[in-house]
Amino acid sequence: AFSIPATVTGIVLVIIGALVIVGGLKRIAAVTEKLVPFMAIAYVIGALIIFFANISHVGAVFTAIFKGAFGLKAVGGGIVGSGVKLALTWGMKRGVFSNEAGLGSSVMVHSSSNVKEPVRQGMWGIFEVFADTMVVCTLTAFAVLSSGLIDLDTGAVLVDVSGSALVGQAFATVFGSFGPAFIAIAILLFAFSTVLGWSHYGSKACEYLFGTKSTIVYKIAFVLMIFIGCTMNLGLAWDLSDTFNGLMAIPNLIGVIALSPVVMKITKNYVARIIKKEDVKPMLSVFPEIQEEQEKAM
């Protein structure tokens, strides 16, 4: 949107990232944390404005989505199954990249929250996935598909852009030149806050595995990877992301399945106490020491 070379962007982000991640300059992180929620709200409002501006296209857009996703146009060719498989594959890849469901990453943040009811915090985790995927992603898809930039019959993109630039052009159909600039700034803030979040995740994992002293090596390597991420081929970046997301999901999902009975017990206890108002002893953790600590806090 601003014609800034990727190399320059990478160098600037490496410097800022180093100040925050390695140097501990929290002021930049604090400003980012305050700006991101406002940008997210502004993005949703902007997408809603596009939605209502093109509301007459709702039927055509959702018809095109289902036809394209599930291969309804190819029923005669007998490849509906292939279309469904492709839709599920790409849906899961991009869904996991967007909402991190099943990766176990957001647990690090949720577990550090100061709440008395773990079930309530877990519900916020579920809500995040719904809001991200069902609300934000759906609004984004509608904004792009209803903008006239894509042929709904063939799926062909009618402009010479793709990815986030396509979203910027979709916003430009309603907001003019402000649209691409807004999307560029929003993505920059979202991406930078994500970088800070994942640096924390990795640092904690490295500390657990190799000790506190190892985190400085990790942080330096992480900051250098910011530049590589800014300049590398986008297709390779997606492939690496999908691969490592899958590798993270495998052990985490095994843990989720193994701990499901415990989660069910704690959830049923919460429903009985809070919703049904039954007089039962709170079950707040499977670990006795944490259970005792939480009971005292209540």
Question: Where are these predicted regions, by residue range?
Answer:
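Terminal cytosolic tails of multi-pass membrane transporters
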Residues: 253-298
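Select transmembrane alpha-helical segments in multipass membrane proteins
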Residues: 9-12, 42, 75-98, 135-137, ...
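Extracellular/periplasmic helix-exit of transmembrane alpha-helices
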Residues: 48-64, 72, 76-79, 112-113, ...
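Membrane-interface alpha-helices at helix entry/exit sites of multi-pass transporters
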Residues: 10, 115-131, 212-220
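Membrane-interface loop-to-helix entry segments
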Residues: 4-66, 206, 238-268, 272
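Hydrophobic alpha-helical transmembrane segments of multi-pass small-molecule transporters/permeases
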Residues: 14-17, 44-47, 91-92, 126-129, ...
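Hydrophobic, membrane-embedded alpha-helices of multi-pass small-molecule transporters
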Residues: 6-14, 52-56, 67-123, 187
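Transmembrane alpha-helical segments of multi-pass small-molecule transport proteins
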Residues: 2-23, 41-42, 180-185, 214-232
